[in-house]
Amino acid sequence: KLMALQLLLWHSALWMVQEATPLGPTSSLPQSFLLKCLEQVRKVQADGTALQERLCAAHKLCHPEELVLLGHALGIPQAPLSSCSSQALQLTGCLRQLHSGLFLYQGLLQALAGISPELAPTLDMLQLDITDFAINIWQQMEDVGMAPAVPPTQGTMPTFTSAFQRRAGGTLVASNLQSFLEVAYRALRHFTKP
């Protein structure tokens, strides 16, 4: 009896380890999808950098770290990517978090509408590219049966009551987006490895 119990415990422990083990690079995602995602990350990064540079040049908001407390007061959320970190890289969780994060940034950028006339085209381009990226990920998740039964919903977005808050929010959102994209890029590159 004791031996059977030990065997059962060993088997269940092995099962739990297998379940928790992050997926390796041999994923079921097509290389064309992964390469397109990497291209989209670079495009969104370039758009985000352009927004940051324009906010810095036009409004002297060049250091997002100086605005962190204001970001907390405004309630600017950050998208989690724990399933995409190198310690816990999991394909399904990572794709879902990528999609949810892009969805969050779509909402944050919409909340920044009216930031300033000179920044509107840059903001619009960034929104379009994020939307395209989110759609691409969602379609792939549906194609391989990974899409959640219920798509993500938009949470409460910050309300910017002044032009300064909107511009400072833009600086923080662009900075947070860049950090999000760096993790996303590393995860996607990992999935492209044979």
Curated annotation (Swiss-Prot):
Modification(s) after translation: O-glycosylated.
Organism superkingdom: Eukaryota
First and last residue of the signal peptide: 1-20
Gene3D superfamilies assigned: 1.20.1250.10
Keyword Secreted belongs to the record: yes
Cellular component GO terms held in the UniProt record: extracellular space
Glycosylation sites: 153
A GO MF term: granulocyte colony-stimulating factor receptor binding
Keyword Glycoprotein: yes
Cited function: Granulocyte/macrophage colony-stimulating factors are cytokines that act in hematopoiesis by controlling the production, differentiation, and function of 2 related white cell populations of the blood, the granulocytes and the monocytes-macrophages. This CSF induces granulocytes.
Self-association state and partner proteins as the record states: Monomer.
Protein name per its UniProtKB record: Granulocyte colony-stimulating factor
Gene name per UniProt: CSF3
